[in-house]
Regions:
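Basic, glycine/lysine-rich polyanion-binding surfaces/domains
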Residues: 1-242, 246
Length: 247
């Protein structure tokens, strides 16, 4: 990822979970430990079905007295509705701020050049009062900034970053085995642990109960996966017979 490039991810949506019960509310639902998340630490997490199947994944960022969920925009309304069904009597407010906030990704080295930044997965700081963090899944995905649309371009200009084709970013992501697009096609088809969520730091096996925790722990204890998401590269051409004929 070039140090001068930035990828404005307009296909990302933002939910804001706020209120006195916001921490407890998320802790009882998501696969990661919300207590890890603070002003200097963000995390990757998922919301699973009661059977432990994949439903949604997102990055959790501390924001004021609540939390921002950075997720794929095409399923942000689904995630919003699912969270509302779990709300019950919890004193929380769930807002869809996708029209107010924008997410952008940029180079790992560029992130480290920001004052106060640390080379730690999920490390979070502020730049021009906006949240900037090192992607909690893989450092090669670089830094992320979550900002109000008007302020975003001011921050990017100040950082001397030029907008580039987001396909470059997603190509890198897929090569790393981290799909971020059309995730609704995986819903209810794979267990969360089969989506490489352990390797991507999305599951905390030491935290208490959450939705789908029982099957997730059972599969982990068996230490055997029947399926797993992997990147696949398709090349043009034909295979010569001598390349696949054994003696």
């Amino acid at each position: 990822m070039n140090t001068e490039k930035v990828y404005i991810l307009e296909d990302r949506g933002i939910l804001y979970i706020n209120g006195p019960d916001s921490e407890k509310f998320l802790q009882n639902l998501i696969s990661n430990d919300i207590e890890k998340v603070n002003e200097s630490k963000s995390c990757f997490a998922s919301l699973l079905s009661p059977q432990g199947k994949f439903l949604f994944d997102f990055i959790v960022v501390k924001h004021k007295d609540g939390y921002l969920l950075d997720c794929e925009k095409r399923i942000v309304d689904q995630l919003y509705k699912k969270l509302v069904t779990y709300k019950l009597r919890s004193d929380v407010e769930i807002l869809n701020l996708s029209n107010e906030f924008v997410v952008a990704a940029f180079n790992h080295e560029k992130f480290l050049s920001i004052e106060g930044a640390k080379d730690e997965l999920g490390y979070t700081t502020k730049y021009n009062e906006d949240h900037v963090l090192l992607d909690p899944r893989n450092k090669k995905l670089g830094g992320r900034i979550i900002a109000n649309l008007e302020k975003l371009y001011m921050s990017l200009k100040k950082m001397k970053l030029k907008s580039s084709n987001i396909e470059e970013y997603y190509k890198l992501s897929f090569e790393l085995g981290i799909p971020q697009s059309n995730m609704d096609q995986l819903q209810e088809k794979l267990f969360g642990i089969e989506c490489n969520f352990v390797e991507l730091n999305a599951i905390d096996f030491k935290k208490g109960c959450y939705v789908g925790q029982e099957n997730t722990s059972r599969i982990k204890n068996k230490d055997k996966l029947n399926k797993r998401l992997l990147p696949l590269q398709v090349k043009k051409g034909s295979i010569r017979s001598e390349e696949h004929t054994s003696e």
